[in-house]
A protein has these predicted regions:
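Conserved, well-structured functional cores that handle cations and Mg-NTP chemistry
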Residues: 1-98, 102-129, 136, 147-150, ...
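Active-site-proximal structural scaffolding
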Residues: 113, 123-125, 184, 213, ...
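Short amphipathic alpha-helical "interface-anchor" segments enriched in bulky aromatics
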Residues: 10-14, 103, 200-231
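Structural motif
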Residues: 32-38, 231-241
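A conserved active-site cap/scaffold subdomain adjacent to cofactor or substrate pockets
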Residues: 186-192, 205-207
Length: 344
């Protein structure tokens, strides 16, 4: 990242698991199904830079009834707070932290952000309480219309207003909705932030990154196979998650936004473009710069090798030296592609 500041999103994800043999599986709330069910839950931290997401850290939540010898029970709040500390100690430059109401309602988590003087935008419950001195009251400002811009650059009209508890404070409270008349539950958010200044036009987009990352991670789970394991031992599950996150990171690193951060990688990419082989001439090459576009292109790069090993057993039955030679030439050409990998 070359010292560039990033936005950090804290979120938990739960996956349904049948039976009771898998480590740390219990009946608990699973966001993926929107109800309490049998499953495993992890708390995850993601980075966002220039509309590209990348994984930073994952910690499994261990319900009390599933603890093993040597385990210590930690709440999701404690796990998230540990993540913030570890990310700061790793030297990440964090310009903003986003989280849902589980963390927004936690004074422990907010204290951890304050400890590092981090800016935050967090969701809170609609019945969030604030202590007020006698004689002070709660009031709501007028609704302000703004354009909510999404990652695909499309926009929709939203409405925002500040809720003031007594006197003006360094921490401010906001309502964001699609319809100020009906306040639909599924498209109305209650938000708390320590950001200063005129936030009416910017806060909606900043907080919207959180839901966008949630959606993006669901796609990642579907595309990369986050839940496609048959292990019951958590060490094996954790290893699987690490592999998925490594692939996720590799795809993100090959996005134009992150490639451009490092001069040597930029030169390498330019050299790649000036090569006599122009991979982007492939009929199915995607020229957009989003995460799924990069994933599509990396899949095209590995296709010849995968297809070769699918066909190879048949060459024992139907020998074809020309086909074998052609595959060798094609794979050699594909090996000239220079993807970006994380250093260290």
């Amino acid at each position: 990242l070359n010292g560039q500041a990033i936005t950090v999103v804290i979120d938990e994800t739960g996956d349904r698991k049948k039976g009771k043999k898998t480590d740390y599986v219990a009946r608990q709330y699973l966001g993926s199904v929107g109800k309490i069910d049998n499953g495993i839950v992890s708390v995850n931290a993601y980075g966002v830079y220039s509309n590209i997401t990348f994984p930073l850290m994952v910690k499994v939540f261990k319900p009390k009834g599933t603890l093993k010898e040597g385990d210590k029970y930690k709440t999701k709040i404690e796990l998230a707070s540990e993540m913030i500390t570890e990310l700061m100690e790793e030297g990440f430059q964090i310009e903003l932290v986003l989280a849902d109401s589980l963390y927004g309602e936690s004074s422990q988590f907010i204290r951890k952000l304050d400890e590092y003087n981090l800016a935050y935008v967090v969701a809170i419950r609609s019945n969030h309480g604030v202590w007020l001195p006698a004689g002070q009251s709660v009031r709501a400002n007028n609704w302000c219309k703004f354009e909510r811009t999404f990652s695909n650059q499309k926009s929709e009209t939203r409405y925002i207003r500040e809720i003031i508890y007594g006197k003006k404070r360094t921490i401010t409270y906001w309502e964001i909705t699609t319809d100020p008349e009906t306040m639909p539950e599924n498209s109305t958010s209650f938000v708390m932030t320590n950001l200063q200044g005129n936030l009416k036009k910017t806060l909606g987009d900043l907080y919207g990154l959180r839901t966008w990352v949630e959606y993006g991670f669901r796609q990642c789970k579907q595309e990369l196979g986050w839940t496609d394991y048959r292990f019951t031992n958590f060490q094996h599950i954790e290893r699987w998650w690490e592999i998925i996150f490594c692939v996720y990171t590799m795809i993100s690193l090959n996005s134009p936004a992150l490639l451009a951060l490092n001069q040597s990688r930029q030169i390498e990419a330019e050299g790649q473009r000036t090569s006599h082989i122009d991979f982007s001439n492939h009929q199915q090459w995607n020229h957009e710069s989003g995460w799924k576009n990069v994933l599509n292109n990396l899949r095209l790069i590995v296709q010849p090798l995968l297809l070769f090993w699918l066909i190879y057993p048949w060459l024992d039955i139907f020998p074809n030296s020309q086909l074998l030679l052609g595959f060798n030439h094609l794979i050699a050409a594909m090996n000239q592609f220079k993807p970006c990998y994380a250093s260290g």
